[in-house]
């Protein structure tokens, strides 16, 4: 029921954004400030965010409906629904964040729940082996992601999307220290490594064959 409500609200949000031009970008809470770098909790809802909210909640709703019958006699029925609900929350936090720190926390939460789901049947040695491999592969991706976020924070002094995009022109004029590479290229490569290693072919290859 909760996921159905979330899907309906997401669809209403998409309608407001797409047809009425509504937009939301606010920082709700400042967690801490370290050396002038603000670590905040905030949300950005634009057309891309609204579309992804609908996709996430719709897919989650379909999974919930299918799971009601598929997992009915499994002793881990309630635990599975807890994992899927946490996965949905993590994905929504990821796509709705207005800063890189919150996005990273959502990203890590998605990785954690993926680890738990891969090893859901923990009495099977193959499942445990597969989720450990997924955990290790994810750490490689996280390293690239953290490097990219760290470079952005170091050269822009902010983690907020709006402020970063406002300084994108300045980043484009800089080179990575000790090389002739453009700084923005290095940052994009780091973020790309984080995304591809964690959630595409490498991960599927390393975990899928063990289940």
Language-model features: where?
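...captures the hydrophobic TM-helix bundle architecture rather than a specific catalytic motif
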Residues: 1-209
């Amino acid at each position: 029921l909760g996921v159905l409500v979330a899907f309906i609200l997401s669809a209403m949000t998409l309608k407001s954004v797409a047809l009425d031009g509504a937009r939301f970008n606010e920082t709700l809470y400042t967690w801490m400030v370290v050396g002038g770098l603000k670590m905040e909790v905030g949300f950005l809802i634009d057309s891309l965010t609204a579309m992804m909210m609908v996709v996430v909640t719709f897919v989650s709703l379909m999974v919930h409906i299918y799971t009601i019958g598929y997992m009915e006699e499994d002793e881990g029925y309630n635990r599975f629904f807890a994992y899927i609900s946490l996965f949905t929350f993590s994905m929504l936090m990821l796509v709705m964040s207005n800063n890189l720190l919150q996005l990273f926390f959502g990203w890590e939460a998605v990785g954690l729940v993926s680890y738990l789901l891969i090893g859901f049947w923990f009495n099977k040695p193959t499942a445990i082996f597969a989720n450990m491999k997924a955990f290790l592969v994810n750490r490689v991706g996280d390293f690239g992601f953290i490097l990219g976020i760290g470079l952005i924070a170091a050269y822009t002094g902010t983690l907020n999307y709006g402020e970063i995009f406002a300084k994108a022109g300045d980043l484009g004029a800089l080179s990575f220290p000790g090389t002739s590479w453009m700084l923005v290229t290095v940052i994009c490569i780091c973020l790309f490594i984080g995304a591809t290693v964690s959630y595409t072919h490498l991960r599927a290859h390393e975990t899928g064959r063990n289940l």
